Amino acid sequence: MATKEKQIIDYFDNIGSHFILDGVPIMEVKLPDEVLDEWLNWSKKYRKWKTHNLSFLKDHINKGENTFQISISTNDLENSINLPFTIRLGEYFMHRLHGLSMVRLRKCITLRTHLGHHDNSDYWLNYTNIGDSNPIHVHAGNLSSVIYIDNVEDTPTYFVLEDGREIRYEPKVGYVLIFPSNQEHYVKEKETDKERVTASFNLNFNNTRYDEAKGDSISHEEVIIKK
């Protein structure tokens, strides 16, 4: 394995990245301070749109019933440490879950984007207030996440497994969960007053590019993402 790829693996290993339960493809990762600080700064910066009289035009609309959701701008992403951290995390997740070659994963994990649309990337903030909820849902793309930014301890995240079991995850500020996009999850109605701030991203995995890449050999069948 190339030295740079090993450096990425060692980094995520050393910050305690782990699957939350044996046999369940949900990985918990502690955010480095630099990444969390960016999220905290963005949560303050983008909050101005939450109370804007035209906020509904900028709202990141999905199945969630949060007070306000908004995508991070392309400019902020391109000048961040968050985006490269996210891409490398996606590569690491695929490496650990499926045993894929980090060398061949280069440029195979990308952010899900929507060129020409104001809501131009699947990289967004969620502002949640009392009475808000997020009913059971899945995400688009191949890999998704929940990022816990501020005041998250009073509202668990629930994951529904294929066998019908539910996992109740007690979140902590400064952590991210990454999982396959087809993993069902939900958040019950918020019952406390203080605003909860989380974020999410959706990533794409390019099967064809991986299959054509040079490097360690692995069969195409092993690449397919499953729950």
Where are these regions (language model features)?
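Non-heme Fe(II)/2-oxoglutarate
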Residues: 2-115, 133, 217, 226
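Surface-exposed beta-strand edges and flanking loops
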Residues: 31, 72-74, 127, 161-162, ...
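Catalytic core of non-heme Fe(II) oxygenases with the double-stranded beta-helix
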Residues: 113-189, 194-198, 202-217
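Structured alpha-helical
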Residues: 222-223
